[in-house]
Structure formats: structure tokens, C-alpha cells
Amino acid sequence: VECNKMNIHTSVIDPNKDSPCKNQCDNFVLGDLNNFDDIVKFGSKCDIITFEIEHINIDALVELENLGKEVYPKSKTLRIIQDKNLQKTFFIDNNIPTAPFKYFESIKDLLTSIDRDKLKFPFVWKQTKFGYDGFGVKVINSASDVEKLPDKPMIVEDYIPFEKELS
């Protein structure tokens, strides 16, 4: 709406044919945000590309950058945002305060760490990819909780009691 007031032409790609933005933009394209070809075809017609959600095909954004398109945030930044392990490592490398964490490739590796008393309950489990707004995040209080987790790469953080989360 604000872009319209400033005479800025907007295009939107969305997988939902009934997307709320459909009636607010100048050009609406129905497309898959994870499909390389959909994103490159869409982005090649734009001057500047930005996105509302982090779950988008990074390789397509790299291709668009290579074609000289302005992409914000940059694909390099998005790659870090999409992976909790890379994100936490970035925080540590840049002296940004964050909860202590460990990375595990599998549930087997996690259980081995618990069995060797290298990890104490409770802790916070986070899948490294495709988690957001509480999805892919669980407080783990016991080994029986671990058995219910999906077997995919993960980080576990020390449990830190808090009053409010800001994001």
C-alpha cells in the first residue's frame, strides 16, 4: 500500500493463489518459493528483490545476484539465517551473546552425549533448518522426550528461564 503511494511498482511471488498481497501489488505471480526456476524467472524481471520469509531457494538468489540483481538480504546472509548451527556459530564468532549450544547430526549422537553425561536436562532442542516461530523447537526434560524427536541435524541449547522472548 505504501509503495503505491510512492509510485513504486511491486511484484510478488507466492504459492497461495489467494494471498492477501495479491490485491495490493502491481504484478502477482503464483509460484513455489523453493523452486529454483520459479524464483529465477520471477526475479529476473525485478530491479530489487527482497522477501518476507526465510524459506526460499538460496541457489536461485545466488543466480540472481550473479545476473547483477540486487537481493536483500544477500544470499550469504540468508544461508546463515536458514541454518541454526551456522547462525549460532556466527553469533559466537562475532561476540554476540547467545545461549551455549552443541550441534548433533543425529538422535543417536544426541543420546550418546546424554549417556556420557555431557548433556543435562532440561535443554532446548532446535532443528537446524526450517524451524520458525516455535516450530522445530522443544524443551526436552527427559530421554523419553528425545525419542519423540525427528532424526535430523539439530542444535541443543542450555535451558535458560526467561520472562519474554523478542524477535
State what each model feature region is.
Residues 1-86, 108:
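ATP-binding N-terminal substructure of ATP-dependent carboxylate-amine bond-forming enzymes
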Residues 23, 61, 135, 166-167:
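Hydrophobic alpha-helical membrane-insertion segments
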Residues 80-166:
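Active-site nucleotide/adenylate-binding loops and adjacent lid/helix of ATP-dependent enzymes
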